[in-house]
Structure formats: C-alpha cells, structure tokens
Swiss-Prot record:
The gene is MED29. It is found in: Nucleus. Widely expressed in embryo and adult. Residues 1-48 are annotated as: Disordered. This is Mediator of RNA polymerase II transcription subunit 29. Its main location: nucleus. Component of the Mediator complex, a coactivator involved in the regulated transcription of nearly all RNA polymerase II-dependent genes. Mediator functions as a bridge to convey information from gene-specific regulatory proteins to the basal RNA polymerase II transcription machinery. Mediator is recruited to promoters by direct interactions with regulatory proteins and serves as a scaffold for the assembly of a functional preinitiation complex with RNA polymerase II and the general transcription factors. It comes from Homo sapiens (Human).
Length: 200
C-alpha cells in the first residue's frame, strides 16, 4: 500500500514538472506593448495636415490641381458622349466600351467649385478679421495653428478676451447713449428693458 502511494506521488510530481509548457502548450503570455508615438517625418506630416485643415489658402492650393483634373475629365466625357450621340443619330454603330456619365462628372466639378468658393470666403473673412484686429487691437495674439511662434510683445489669450469684452461693453454704452439722445430729440419715451441686461 505504501509502495503504491509512493508511485502515485512520484507520477503526480513528474506530471507537475512536465506541465503544459513541456508538453508543447502555450508559455507565459506577453503583455501588449503600447503603440509607438509619432516621431520624425510622421509627426511633421501630421502637423502639416492639421495646418492645411485650418488654413483655407493651403486647402485652396490643394484643391486647384483636383479642379483642373476634374475639368479635363468633364471635357473628355462630354466629347465622348457627343460623338456617341452623333453616331446614333446617323445610324452608325457606337463604341461598345462603357462611357462615363456626363452628369456625374459635372456634379463632381461643381462640388469642387463649391469647396473652392467656401475656401475663398473663409480666407476673405479671416483677412477682414485680421485687419479689424490689427486696427482695434494691434498687439499680437498667438494663433492655434502656430502656438510656438510667440513673440515677446504678444498678448496672452485671457487678456485678449478681457480687451474684447471691454470693447463690447463700450460699444453697448455708445449704442445706449445714442438711443437716449435720439429719444430725447424725437420726444419719445424709452421702452422698459425686456430683461436684466436690457435690449439693444
């Protein structure tokens, strides 16, 4: 009985020593490594893409070659459709190859034109705001696309917000003063304010 117990314990210990790894089973699992950060050209390419998304002029320059290619395709498809319709009217056999639809090419061309128009409008609006900012607040403010290009005389953004709020308050005061003066001249009594802040 003791011999059989010794044999059973020896067999169990041998099985424990061999284990799943010795039998060809999977070993210890490796921990997943975190994704590598973008460095070098990849990071610069990402920054350039972000600048193109923010800058309407860069996006306009990027869309111009696409517009030229779309116009060439549109003219080519129009010529092919015209030739095919002429051959059909004359009773001749048309080409067996598939021909692109003219309306699809025209729709793509107009879509690119709409994008270019939006870019030009946005660029014009940015230029107008820049001119107004340079006129009423000549101190520079760091932009979101170039946060590192901070000059010594630049104005911090919180302080810039305070300046803008002061300008808005001054504009409201001027508007109220002009409205009171106009009411006194015409003899009208001013209407009571609709809320705590009043109405403009």
């Amino acid at each position: 009985m003791a011999a059989s117990q010794q044999q059973a314990s020896a067999a169990s210990s041998a099985a424990g020593v061999s284990g799943p790894s010795s039998a060809g089973g999977p070993g210890p699992q490796q921990q997943p490594q975190p994704p590598a950060q973008l460095v070098g050209p990849a990071q610069s390419g990402l920054l350039q893409q972000q600048q193109q998304d923010f800058d309407p002029v860069q996006r306009y320059k990027m869309l111009i070659p696409q517009l030229k290619e779309s116009l060439q395709t549109l003219m080519k498809v129009a010529a092919q459709n015209l030739i095919q319709n002429t051959n059909i009217d004359n009773g001749q056999k048309s080409s067996d190859g598939p021909i692109q639809r003219f309306d699809k090419c025209l729709e793509e061309f107009y879509a690119l034109c709409d994008q270019l128009e939006l870019c030009l409008r946005l660029a014009h609006e940015c230029l107008s705001q820049s001119c107004d900012s340079a006129k009423h607040s000549p101190t520079l403010v760091p932009t979101a696309t170039k946060p590192d290009a901070v000059q010594p005389d630049s104005l911090p953004y919180p302080q810039y917000l305070a300046v803008i709020k002061a300008q808005i308050s001054c504009a409201k005061d001027i508007h109220t003063a002009l409205l009171d003066c106009a009411n006194k001249v015409t003899g009208k009594t001013p209407a009571p304010p609709a809320g705590p802040g009043g109405t403009l």
